[in-house]
């Protein structure tokens, strides 16, 4: 079988104008960026305001191996499968960060015959939205240090007299807005800025600083959760950048940088239209990670697609304990649109990995033994799939299991897994997923199950209520959402939660930052653990995005590169074609 990039390169694509017309967009509702990309205006939502929304299908997964279990392949393949059954369909996915592209996982365009194309354009820069997020974020960071410098170098009164602006009196030790970049770089997690020659202050005042990856920026979450440009502007104004010497929050609005930040994101608020290898219109928008952010593509993209098509297939990052939980408790509470159906991607290798019999490490190849028949390991890891099915139903959502087939998989084990699922005392559908090898035709069985599931009654219910305290919400997600026995809070986390409640942020949602490699916060606990303890070490405020996020375990908001990064395989030939991208 050809490599992903060779399949993509040898598949004829349609001009993006044809894809836009197929989706139902008018000529003034999109702007082309080259031959195969276009920015889409939300004007079409107003035009189609009376149009009934389509069905929203959310693709999630079991607890994955470090290389993932094929959610994007399933998302794109399912959209193609629905099209193959003559359904009107669009897909919505996140924009890939270049951190994973050059780091461990590689690209995020899908794979095989279920890809978004051109995959190299998708994985590398696209239309520049992540760079715009990075620029807007770092503009605020520069504004903070500039304000500290100008206020302190001659004193607050002199600053006010000189500028006519109120002195914000920012506490340099309580700046909470780190800088960001779209690469994995562990050396930047903790740095010092404002270094000067002795006796000088020309470079600003020295303080401790750090970098996050751009996907973890609050602006990325705001981009994904905003309903329109004005909503984004208001949210950016609410972002808390620092605290002053009296312990009061200093916002982007107070720093008078919110308008310029929004201007920087003016084009980024428009989703990018591309196509799958079989011509399904696909919107790519926003790229928050699911382990350190809320892990779902944008509300705006969903809204556009739901007005234009009968089915919209989107995905949520990592397993259902991560992206699905956040889709239900953060995204849906903002958009007021819950999924009509959940598709849970399962693989033989992923379930065997959840047996706990294999030592898997991020950045290292999966052991060959994972692809060998092993009924005992499969049966042991099956508890993980049962947990994720039950988790989807916890939110009142109909579920379909898509068993993502790999070429090495045993037909006997695939049949056995399907039988076990059918024998569960749960209302769940199941089909074998062959989107990687066969494209849409290989996904028709899953598509039929999804159509039936979308017609079944749903009784959506989030885990917690807005009026609960932040601590209660965190405990609810950990106990009801993960099955943990006890939640502990560090002294730092307790102080932060008390501060946020006092400042009036108690009604915000909570976003858990934890390992994706276990339902718990300990990546070594496989299968379906219960009764474990979760330690919340820190809670950060994202007032503009509308949530606080609680850091657990050893989750880092700036990833590092592995021993053998994916960038080592990348190059370019004499024709300008990229090689080694997957």
From Swiss-Prot:
GO molecular function, one term: formate-tetrahydrofolate ligase activity
Disulfide bonds: none
Residues reported in the UniProt entry to bind ATP: 65-72
Highest taxon, organism lineage: Bacteria
Catalytic reaction equation(s): (6S)-5,6,7,8-tetrahydrofolate + formate + ATP = (6R)-10-formyltetrahydrofolate + ADP + phosphate
CDD domains per the UniProt record, alphabetical: FTHFS
Pathway: One-carbon metabolism; tetrahydrofolate interconversion
A GO BP annotation: tetrahydrofolate interconversion
EC number of the protein: 6.3.4.3
Family to which the UniProt record says this protein belongs: Belongs to the formate--tetrahydrofolate ligase family.
Name of the protein: Formate--tetrahydrofolate ligase
Organism: Vibrio vulnificus (strain YJ016)
Gene: fhs
């Amino acid at each position: 079988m050809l490599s992903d990039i060779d399949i993509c390169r040898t598949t004829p694509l349609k001009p993006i104008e044809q894809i836009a017309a197929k989706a139902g967009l008018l000529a003034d509702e999109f702007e082309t960026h080259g031959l195969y990309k276009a920015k889409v205006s939300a004007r079409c939502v107003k035009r189609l305001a009376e149009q009934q929304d389509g069905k929203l299908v959310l693709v999630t997964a079991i607890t994955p191996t470090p290389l993932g279990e094929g959610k994007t392949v399933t998302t794109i393949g399912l959209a193609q499968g629905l099209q193959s059954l003559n359904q009107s369909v669009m897909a919505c996915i996140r924009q890939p960060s270049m951190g994973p592209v050059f780091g461990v996982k590689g690209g995020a365009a899908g794979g095989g015959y279920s890809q978004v194309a051109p995959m190299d354009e998708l994985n590398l820069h696209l239309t520049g939205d992540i760079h715009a997020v990075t620029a807007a974020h770092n503009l605020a960071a520069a504004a903070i240090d500039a304000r500290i410098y100008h206020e302190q170098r001659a004193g607050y009164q002199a600053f006010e007299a000189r500028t006519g602006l109120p002195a914000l009196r920012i506490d340099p030790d309580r700046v909470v807005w780190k800088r960001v970049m779209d690469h994995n770089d562990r050396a930047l997690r903790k740095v010092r800025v404002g270094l000067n020659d002795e006796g000088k202050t020309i470079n600003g005042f020295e303080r401790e600083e750090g970098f996050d990856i751009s996907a973890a920026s609050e602006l990325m979450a705001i981009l994904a959760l905003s309903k329109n440009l004005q909503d984004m502007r208001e949210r950016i104004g609410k972002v808390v950048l620092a605290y002053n010497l009296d312990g009061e929050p200093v916002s982007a609005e107070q720093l008078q940088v919110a308008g310029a930040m929004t201007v920087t994101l003016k084009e980024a608020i428009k989703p990018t239209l591309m196509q799958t290898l079989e011509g399904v219109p696909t919107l790519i928008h926003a790229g928050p990670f699911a382990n350190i952010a809320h892990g779902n593509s944008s509300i705006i993209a969903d809204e556009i697609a739901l007005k234009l098509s009968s089915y919209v297939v989107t995905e949520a990052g990592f397993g259902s304990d991560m992206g699905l939980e956040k889709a239900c408790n953060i995204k849906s509470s903002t958009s007021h649109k819950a999924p009509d159906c959940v598709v849970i991607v399962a693989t033989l290798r992923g379930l065997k990995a959840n047996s706990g019999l294999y030592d898997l490490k991020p950045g290292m190849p999966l052991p060959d033994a994972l692809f060998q028949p092993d009924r005992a390991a499969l049966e042991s890891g099956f508890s993980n799939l049962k947990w994720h099915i039950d988790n989807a139903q916890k939110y009142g959502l109909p579920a379909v299991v898509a068993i993502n087939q790999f070429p090495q998989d045993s037909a006997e084990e695939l049949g056995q897994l399907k039988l076990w699922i059918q024998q569960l005392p749960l209302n769940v559908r199941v089909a074998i997923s062959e989107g990687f090898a066969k494209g849409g035709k290989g996904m028709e069985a899953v598509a039929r199950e999804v159509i039936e599931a979308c017609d079944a009654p749903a009784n959506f219910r989030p885990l917690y209520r807005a009026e609960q305290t932040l601590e209660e919400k965190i405990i609810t997600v950990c106990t009801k959402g993960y099955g943990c026995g006890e939640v502990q809070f560090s002294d730092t986390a307790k102080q932060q939660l008390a501060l946020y409640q006092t400042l009036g942020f108690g009604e915000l949602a909570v976003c858990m930052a934890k390992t994706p490699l276990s339902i718990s916060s300990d990546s070594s606990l496989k299968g379906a653990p219960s009764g474990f303890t979760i330690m919340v070490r820190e809670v950060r405020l994202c007032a503009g995005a509308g949530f606080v996020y609680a850091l657990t375990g050893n989750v880092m908001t700036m990833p590092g590169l592995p021993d053998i990064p994916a960038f080592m395989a990348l190059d370019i030939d004499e024709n300008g074609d990229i090689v080694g991208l997957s």
